[in-house]
Amino acid sequence: MSVEEDATVREPLDLIRLSIEERIYVKLRSDRELRGKLHAFDQHLNMILGDVEEVITTIEIDDETYEEIVRTTKRTVPFLFVRGDGVILVSPPLRTT
């Protein structure tokens, strides 16, 4: 297979395949977001990410004023296994030609 054929996108998972060893953005259920280096994935979108920054957003309602209180929690994880059934969106890095 030539380099040109290897770099083409014919199926949705091809776009993710081209992002191996690059930083990607993953949005998960439960208002979780991940940014990390993609090391491996499969057809179920199970992924192994390295150097991961996880952001968890929680929204609470104040009992007295009924205002929304938005809180974000961040953590850094060296390696993370992401189960594919919780993945909503995968965004590859921006590419400039």
Swiss-Prot record:
GO terms for molecular function: RNA binding. Keywords: Acetylation, Cytoplasm, mRNA processing, mRNA splicing, Nucleus, Ribonucleoprotein, RNA-binding, Spliceosome. Transmembrane segments: none annotated. Its main location: cytoplasm. GO terms for cellular component: Lsm1-7-Pat1 complex; Lsm2-8 complex; nucleus; P-body; spliceosomal complex. It is found in: Cytoplasm; Nucleus. CDD domains: LSm3. Residues 11-96 form the Sm domain. Expressed in roots, leaves, stems, flowers and siliques. Component of LSM protein complexes, which are involved in RNA processing. Component of the cytoplasmic LSM1-LSM7 complex which is involved in mRNA degradation by promoting decapping and leading to accurate 5'-3' mRNA decay. The cytoplasmic LSM1-LSM7 complex regulates developmental gene expression by the decapping of specific development-related transcripts. Component of the nuclear LSM2-LSM8 complex which is involved splicing nuclear mRNAs. This is Sm-like protein LSM3A. The gene is LSM3A.
